[in-house]
Structure formats: C-alpha cells, structure tokens
C-alpha cells in the first residue's frame, strides 16, 4: 500500500501543526508559566506566516509559488530551531540577544529586574520524551521541507 500526500493535504497538515504549535507555546507560556527565550519567540514567526500560506495554498493549490514559500518558511524554521537545539546541547555559543535583555539599563533596580527576567537560550526548560521543543521543531520542520519538496518535484515529473 503506497501512501501519497496530495498538495491540499500537506497544506491541511501543516496548517493544523502550525496552529497546534502556536497554541501549545501560548499554553506553556501563559498557563504553565514557563517563559520563552528569544530564540523560542523567533521560532514562532514561521508558524504564524505558515498559517496564512496554508490557507492560501489550500484554495490555490495549483500554484507552485505558495508551496515554495512554505518550503522557504520551514527551511528558516529548521535553521532557527536547529541553531537553538545546538545552543541547548553545547554545539554553538549563545548570541548576544540570548544573554542580555536590554543594554540601555538606567538604574540598579532595572538591572536587577532584567537579570531575573532574562531567559537563557541554552536552558531547555520544557521537554517532551526527553527532547526539547526546539529539537522537535528541528525534526518536524525538516520533515515538512522534505515532504513538500517531494510533492513539488513528484507532481512536476508526473
């Protein structure tokens, strides 16, 4: 039995995954009380844009441009998440944005407050089955890119 994914189906799958990822991040942050680091926030951006492109792609599924945009978005997501996962596991150093919230601190009180709020990118606070959310995002983003490329090239060579 051969499983084939049609273009409309990939848009629906990615749409539901993107919505679930955003809602999960909001739940983890606001209900469970885990504060995200800057890279965690950056990883949400491709998901927000992908929701828009998935709606477009579902209705205009014959256009290659929308699928290519989706591939680019999740390639960016893969890079950001992979970099974040690398920081968490010590493969890369934290960039300046991870370690300092605000360089324009005026008073001692603001300095102390910024130290308590600052979240390090190398601390994986929330894990599922022992893998951080950035690790899962890296894997799933790469999977979406591979499946989307397969659909794009398979339909062209069909």
Residue ranges and their predicted role:
Residues 48-60, 142-153:
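Membrane-interfacial alpha-helical segments at the cytosolic side of multi-pass membrane proteins
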Residues 90-134:
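Extracytosolic (periplasmic/ER-lumenal) interhelical loops and adjacent juxtamembrane/interface segments
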């Amino acid at each position: 039995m051969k499983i084939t994914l049609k273009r409309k189906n990939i848009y629906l799958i990615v749409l539901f995954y993107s919505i679930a990822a955003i809602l999960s991040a909001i739940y983890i942050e606001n209900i469970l009380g885990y504060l995200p680091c800057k890279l965690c926030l950056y990883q949400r951006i491709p998901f927000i844009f992908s929701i828009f492109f998935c709606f477009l792609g579902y209705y205009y599924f014959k256009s290659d441009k929308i699928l290519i945009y989706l591939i680019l978005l999740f390639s960016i997501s893969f890079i950001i998440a992979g970099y974040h996962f690398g920081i968490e596991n010590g493969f890369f150093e934290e960039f300046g944005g991870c370690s300092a919230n605000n360089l324009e601190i005026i008073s001692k009180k603001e300095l102390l407050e910024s130290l308590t709020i600052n979240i390090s990118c190398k601390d994986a606070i929330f894990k599922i089955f022992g893998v951080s959310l950035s690790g899962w995002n890296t894997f799933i983003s790469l999977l979406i890119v591979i499946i989307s490329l397969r659909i794009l090239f398979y339909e062209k060579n069909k």
